[in-house]
Regions:
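Cyclic-nucleotide recognition modules
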Residues: 72-130, 134
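Cyclic nucleotide-binding regulatory domains
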Residues: 12, 37-100
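A generic structural signal for short hydrophobic patches within well-formed alpha-helices
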Residues: 21, 111-112, 222-223
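Cyclic nucleotide-binding regulatory module and flanking cytosolic helices
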Residues: 1-35, 79, 84-85
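Phosphate-/nucleic-acid-contacting segments
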Residues: 148, 155, 159-226
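Signal-transducing alpha-helical linker
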Residues: 134, 141-144, 148
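Short loop/turn motifs at secondary-structure junctions and domain boundaries
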Residues: 22-23, 39-43, 169
Length: 226
């Protein structure tokens, strides 16, 4: 698929004029990363807006000691690095490829020029940033107010709504590839062993099922979890 066609399907560019998308698409570069590769560091100037085409990118923040917390896990169609359009703004997280990943990178200067010509993209970009801020606030409030099972339910439901698809065979959502138990632990501020026990209990209660990198989430888990 051509870069222009990709941009037309991805927020914040869905309302931009085709001619403007063609101009922006000519500046785009495809980037491929192997698992555990770092795209940009916390505190570093963002070198562009990235659109995830394939794979999964974790946005990570270092916490006390040698631990880190995954604030967001992005799949195909999701973006990061949008603050590159604002001179002097740095990344607030470290972006790490969780699996083999491919992205489309839009240089910051090209994005800034596009925003000057397309005010609707500006509005959609602001909405996108607001939604990301709300997600980070939800993670923070979960760490402070919820136990591990509640945090894990919220995390899985959020991933299913953003990256999952309806299961045509039965009621539920398919999440594939699902993050590893170690990644889930870093998303909920716990350890892998606790997450493993919690997932087993949820499976016994019929909330989740599956094997390997594929998980099916019960409708009640996705629909009733904030």
């Amino acid at each position: 698929m051509e870069a222009q066609d990709i941009l037309s399907c991805v927020e914040p560019f869905t309302a931009a004029r085709p001619a403007e998308l063609e101009v922006l698409g000519r500046t785009a570069v495809r980037v491929r990363k192997t698992p555990a590769s770092i795209l940009c560091h916390d505190g570093q100037l963002a070198d562009g807006l990235y659109i995830v085409l394939r794979g999964r990118i974790n946005l990570v923040r270092a916490v006390d000691g040698n631990r880190d917390l995954i604030l967001s896990s992005l799949g195909p169609g999701e973006v990061f690095g949008e603050n590159c359009a604002m001179p002097g703004m740095v990344m607030s997280t470290t972006a790490v490829a969780a699996v083999q990943s491919e992205m489309l990178r839009i240089p910051g200067e090209a994005l800034s020029e596009h925003l000057r010509r397309e005010p609707e993209t500006v509005v959609r970009l602001m909405r996108l940033q607001y939604e990301k801020l709300r997600e980070v606030e939800a993670v923070a409030s979960g760490l402070a107010l919820c136990d591990v099972e509640q945090r894990l339910r919220r995390t899985l439901a959020r991933l299913a709504r953003r990256q999952g698809r309806r299961n045509p065979a039965s009621a539920g959502w398919i999440l594939a590839p699902v993050p590893t138990q170690s990644e889930l632990a870093r998303m909920v501020g716990s350890c892998r062993e606790t997450v493993s026990r919690t997932l087993s209990a949820m499976a016994r209660n019929g909330l989740v099922s599956g094997s390997g990198r594929r998980m099916i989430l019960n409708d009640s888990l996705v629909n009733e979890t904030p």
